[in-house]
Amino acid sequence: MSTKELYIGVMSGTSMDGVDCALVEFDQEQVRLIAHSDYPMPADLRQKLLSVCTGQATNLKQIGELDHRLGHLFADAVMDLLSQAGVDTSQIRAIGNHGQTVFHQPNGEFPFTTQLGDANIIATRTNIDTVADFRRKDMALGGQGAPLVPAFHQSVFALQDSTTVVLNIGGIANISVLHPTRPVLGYDTGPGNMLMDAWCETHTQQNYDKDARFALQGEVNEALLNTLLQEPYLHQDAPKSTGRELFNMEWLTAKLQGQNYRSEDVQRTLCEYTALTISKEVERFRYGPTPQLLVCGGGARNPLLMQRLQQQLSHWQVSTTDAKGVSGDYMEAMAFAWLAYRHLHRLPSNLPEVTGASRLASLGVLYSKA
């Protein structure tokens, strides 16, 4: 009897540059990416989401409408993937949908996290059971609700005699530390592409700095870099997580303190800032003769950022997850397909040593197609 099952993972990250979908085959714990797609996010929807995420005035009506629109967007993305792959909905066991994070507050008196994208709409429109709301049970157990992907990394990248660190550079950068003799660790190191993208969009009207062309026109401003490195989040102990609530244009504007920096120098400095905050954390976990850093996410396509990581981590073998046979562009979408698989099989999917939760738990809520 075949144990193979098909799941779809849907991910819209902090960069909000589109919806990543991954069609994934599971044969027990063996994982194989069958097909993938990028589905564009309408510009007006992205702008409305960005305004909510950066703390601009909103109301329940707007939040409800965004939740509805995103539900339809995610359903459209799933149907587009199935059409491209020539796969019928009846063949899919479930969808794992992350949703669009608009606020994440894991600390304080009332911790909470909010992801939009009505899973009822996804399930009924696609006629596929949908698992969503993955983060809040971990938070109910005292955890950060993030990061969740290290558990998937642990299942995919076998431990060897040296440390393997999986680095995802999305809007935020996060690491999964797979040590040969110690429990898995994982946390957000700080900004990934978020500040670079925001500054680039403000000054060049491009969503991101393609091939680091803008940054390469500038030079690192050491005074500004030192100011950025004073950010208290960087000095907190793990478990910890962050997002657009902290690292946004308001934060950056405050750090610039009205100084008249050249825009290209700021871009170059932000790239250096991202590289330094990542490499400082990665270097803490060097162990064994051949420690390796596997990079995934959009930042892996930034040649300047990758060059600086290689230079700052000279004792590490730096490559992408693609070199290990796992798509770096669809890693997170694959992870949420895996989380849906774990939910339906009633298997734990958080790592308390990563998130700070009090115990293991099967994450997510099932939204039935029926």
Swiss-Prot record:
Classification via HAMAP family: AnhMurNAc_kinase
UniProt cross-references to Pfam families, sorted A to Z: AnmK
Chain's role: Catalyzes the specific phosphorylation of 1,6-anhydro-N-acetylmuramic acid (anhMurNAc) with the simultaneous cleavage of the 1,6-anhydro ring, generating MurNAc-6-P. Is required for the utilization of anhMurNAc either imported from the medium or derived from its own cell wall murein, and thus plays a role in cell wall recycling.
Molecular functions per Gene Ontology: ATP binding; kinase activity; phosphotransferase activity, alcohol group as acceptor
Name the record gives this protein: Anhydro-N-acetylmuramic acid kinase
Pathway: Amino-sugar metabolism; 1,6-anhydro-N-acetylmuramate degradation; Cell wall biogenesis; peptidoglycan recycling
Taxonomic source organism: Vibrio vulnificus (strain CMCP6)
Enzyme class: transferase
Family to which this protein belongs: Belongs to the anhydro-N-acetylmuramic acid kinase family.
One of the GO BP terms on file: peptidoglycan turnover
Catalytic function, reaction form: 1,6-anhydro-N-acetyl-beta-muramate + ATP + H2O = N-acetyl-D-muramate 6-phosphate + ADP + H(+)
Residue numbers binding ATP: G13, T14, S15, M16, D17, G18, V19, D20
Swiss-Prot/TrEMBL keywords: ATP-binding, Carbohydrate metabolism, Kinase, Nucleotide-binding, Transferase
EC number: 2.7.1.170
Positions of transmembrane segments: none
Source superkingdom: Bacteria
InterPro entries linked: Anhydro_N_Ac-Mur_kinase, ATPase_NBD
